[in-house]
Every structure is written in C-alpha cells, then in structure tokens.
Amino acid sequence: MTLPAFKAYDIRGRVPDELNEDLARRIGVALAAQLDQGPVVLGHDVRLASPALQEALSAGLRASGRDVIDIGLCGTEEVYFQTDYLKAAGGVMVTASHNPMDYNGMKLVREQARPISSDTGLFAIRDTVAADTAGPGEPTASEQSRTDKTAYLEHLLSYVDRSTLKPLKLVVNAGNGGAGLIVDLLAPHLPFEFVRVFHEPDGNFPNGIPNPLLPENRDTTAKAVKDNGADFGIAWDGDFDRCFFFDHTGRFIEGYYLVGLLAQAILAKQPGGKVVHDPRLTWNTVEQVEEAGGIPVLCKSGHAFIKEKMRSENAVYGGEMSAHHYFREFAYADSGMIPWLLISELVSQSGRSLADLVEARMQKFPCSGEINFKVADAKASVARVMEHYASLSPELDYTDGISADFGQWRFNLRSSNTEPLLRLNVETRGDAALLETRTQEISALLRG
C-alpha cells in the first residue's frame, strides 16, 4: 500500500482517496505504539471532514489503550500548548491549513510538543499503517473533552505589558479559519478596536481558502486597512500557525522584516538571548539581533530543524521569513497569536507606526522575496548559477541549499522540502538597482 499523504513534516492528502477515516483510525493505532506512556491531545480545524477524522483517530488511540483529551475546534498551536501544559504523551492537530478544499491532514507531536517528522517517527508510523490489516478494535481507554482555553489565553497575554498598550485599530482577517475565535476571547483583555474580516469559522470557505499569501486574499486585508484607517492589519491561515502583517497604507510586510522586529521585542524582555533564524535572508535579522544585544544562530529552514536548534541552544525566539515564529516559553513551538500581540506592544510603546518600524530596514536590506522556479533538472540549474558567479569568489554556506555572499549582495538557492521547486532569495546592502539586476540575472540562468 502506498500512502502519499505522509510527507516529510506532516500528513496531507486528498479526502477520501489519500486520507480517510479508516486511515485515521490506523494512524491512531500506530501513533500509540510510538509514544511514551500518557494521554494524547487531539484537536481539529474548521474543515468539514476534520471532526470525523479526529473521531476515527481517537478510536484508534483508545483501542490501543490510550486516553484521549479532546480540545475540539482549535488552532495548531493550541494542540502544541496543551500537549506541553497538560504533560501529555503527544498530540495531533487535524488540519490541512491553507491547502485546497478537498485536502485534509495531521500534524503530530510527542511529549513537550516535540515534532514527529519523517526521521523521528512519522515514516515508522506510515510503515505500520501500511502493514496494518486488523479491523477496528473496541476502545479500552477514555476520552475527555477539555475546551477550556484559559491557560492558553493567559499564556498569550503574558508576552505583553497590557498597561502600555494604546487603543489601536486593527484589521483582523481570519479567512473563515479558526483565528477569529481566539481574537474574540482576547479582545476583552485588550484596549484595541478590531475590524473583523471573514471572521466566522466556516469550513466551506465562502471567501476562498485561508491563505493570506494569495494576491486576491492580500487585497481584501489591504483594502480593509485603508478603508477603516487602521493602524495595521493581521491575516492568518486556516489553523493560524502563521500570521501576516499589513501596515497602515495596506502594504504587505515581507515576513523577513518581522523576524528582526520580533527578535528585538523578545530581547528587550530577555536580554542577551539567542535567536535562531533561517539562511534564506539573513543580514537584517543578524544586524537587529546584535543591535539588541542578542546572539544570532543560523539554522536550516523547517519547523523541526528550528525547534531542535532552539532547544539545543536554549534560544529565546526563532523566526523564519515564511511567517513561522517560535518562542521558548511556548514549548519552543510556533504561534500565530504571540507575534501580533508583540507588534501591537512595540507600536504602542515606541509611538511609531509599523510602516515606520520596517521602512528603514527595507531600505537598508532590500530583498526579492521568495521566488519559486519549476525546473526540469534542479542540479543542472544550480550548477549554471554557481558556474556563472564562480569568478567572483563568493563566500559559500551550505546550511540550507547554497548561500553565496558577494559582500554587497547575497543569494540563497534551495530545493523545496515539500514541492518539486527551486526557491530563490536575493538581498543587497541598500542597493535596489543591484537587487533587481541580480535577481533577473539568476532567474534567467535558472530558466536556462
């Protein structure tokens, strides 16, 4: 049996041909054998198939003698938080995040919300599922519902000094995913005025898949910010593990520039800490971390790598330009809620707009943003690029793909971990024209 839904970091596939209730039950059985003793936390997103998949997963776990803690409709980060907070043996979030309508999936963790990836148990679970011919067993363990979010909400609010927050007007676009529920629970504790866009959870996604990176989805948030004179806007994907920012002019802020800002916000509270970042774009992050008295630590991109590096380095914060932000006190997990609270505090305390906070950084280190290339032969394409620039003798780093530093500009070129693509990022030291030239040059070389 081939099981294409098992990816490097999670399970994702079309329902029902690649992921269904029978497979979910068998995943529960296989997961039970992978974990230390203790209960398992389960939660699900707003997708229509998610509750049934979670129920089947629960049946498999309980038939294997595992007690289940059902936290219901939630965000991925809530499964991470509750797994750690309740000292559970593991947790599973049933979600397909921003994938197409007919998809669903699962994100799995063991104790302390440690990721279960291909090399830390996920492919072993896949192989067990493929070999499982037994029918459903009778549940021998219990399931309890635990939908109280108090501890999670208190933890989120602990990141900011509420007495310093100003009455900001914020556009919040949940994309009909789960983020709106948490915004509403936080709202009574905050002085903000919220302009709610596509706020109600709706697994039919009447306004499109909640992927804020799609141009049409960006436009909705940007327009709402401008029309309402908001201080800034925030948009989330369906399971709200990523959040995206728009300044008061409606301009989308590249995730890269948020990493440096959030690092400074965290380092102000935890001086001298280490900050883990990915190699795709680095100069701005390194400078802002060092200016704030922190220590930047380079790490391969991908949540499993970032979390592992943060643990080994005892880092206070980790940030990826892909809008994943990780916090030590949050079980080293990523959160889409903590970042906007920190940015709100930063804007309130500094008296500066988000646009003002990032403008100088964007001028100092302009970047291309990530550009994806579908190429027939990835190795040949990369070789063409490296051969072209060999005479310039760049400083090379292989932490994640190839990073080439030419002094006044640099690029990172890497294969996608999840798709058949080459991903390019270019940045310069304050030279927008050079950025344009080099980006076009490399793009032409990659296309052959």
Predicted regions span which residues?
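An N-terminal, well-structured beta->alpha segment
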Residues: 1-59, 63-65, 89, 145-168
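Short glycine-rich phosphate-binding loop at a beta-alpha junction
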Residues: 39-45, 169-171, 273-277, 316
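N-terminal small/polar loop signature for handling phosphorylated ligands or for N-terminal nucleophile
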Residues: 40-104, 186-246
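Gly/Ser/Thr-enriched, mixed-charge loops and adjacent short helices
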Residues: 104-228
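Phosphate-binding and adjacent anionic-ligand microenvironments
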Residues: 270-448
